[in-house]
Design a protein with these regions (language model features):
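Amphipathic alpha-helical packing segments from all-alpha helical-bundle domains
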Residues: 81, 117-143, 154-158, 182
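Short hydrophobic clusters on alpha-helical segments that form packing/core surfaces
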Residues: 12-20, 90, 164
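Amphipathic alpha-helical segments used for helix-helix packing
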Residues: 82, 97-118
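Generic hydrophobic, amphipathic alpha-helix propensity
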Residues: 8-17, 33-34, 58-62, 66, ...
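Helix-turn-helix
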Residues: 11, 19-53, 57
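Hydrophobic alpha-helical connector segments
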Residues: 70-102, 153-160
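Hydrophobic alpha-helical segments that form the core
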Residues: 101, 106, 151-170, 183-190
Length: 203
């Protein structure tokens, strides 16, 4: 009969997220992980497999809380508010990150995804989910007449995703709200539909 685990799996996985997030995949050793998680190396292997398997679990945990839960929470807001709140939370997270760890997703995209086809697929699934969220908000905003009709909805969503990733990279160098919000103001201005009666032809 298998012995019950002598640790809280959610708690130690969160510790693994913090360890990988702070140091990256390559620089993090199994010894580092075991020390951060408060378990032995043997317990780590028995519970989670090797370092690569644990990294994927940590990545999935981060994505669930940092991306999918946020999308679900913002989905039913008015479309412009949903988009702006998504970005505002990213700016706030950057401001509250004195270690300048950046975004685990972006870090993984740069470090592992180019060299690991399987993991690249996981990253693309997350990026696609974010772009789909932005596309839904653009389409809803156009139906309400509050989002510009310039450009295909998926291309506008791709622009928003690109700006988001750039914002997260820049935040590792300069997370000041002044700089980050300064990047976003013209983006949001481009996103808004022109006022009615300005001579713009209807769609």
């Amino acid at each position: 009969m298998a012995r019950p685990r002598a640790f809280d799996e959610a708690e130690v996985l969160e510790a693994a997220v913090d360890c990988f997030w702070s140091q990256g995949y390559e620089a993090t050793s199994v010894r580092d992980l075991a020390a951060e998680m408060g378990i032995t190396g043997a317990s780590l292997y028995n519970a989670f497999g090797d370092k690569r398997a644990l990294y994927e679990l940590a990545f999935d945990r981060y994505v669930r809380a940092g991306v999918h839960d946020r999308i679900a929470r913002l989905e039913d807001l008015p479309p412009l508010e949903a988009i702006e709140t998504f970005f505002a939370e990213v700016v706030e997270n950057a401001r509250a990150d004195p270690a300048r760890k950046g975004c685990f997703l972006v870090n993984a995209t740069l470090e592992l995804a180019p060299h690991d086809p399987e993991f690249r697929g996981h990253v693309m699934d997350v990026l696609d989910a974010m772009q789909a969220f932005f596309r839904r908000q653009v389409e809803k905003g156009r139906a309400l007449g509050v989002v510009t009709r310039s450009g295909a909805a998926d291309e506008v969503a791709g622009m928003l995703l690109g700006q988001l990733l750039g914002l997260r990279v820049l935040s590792r160098v300069d997370p000041s709200p002044e700089r980050l919000n300064g990047m976003l103001r013209p983006l949001f201005a481009l996103l808004r539909a022109p006022p009615q009666g300005d001579g713009t032809a209807p769609p």
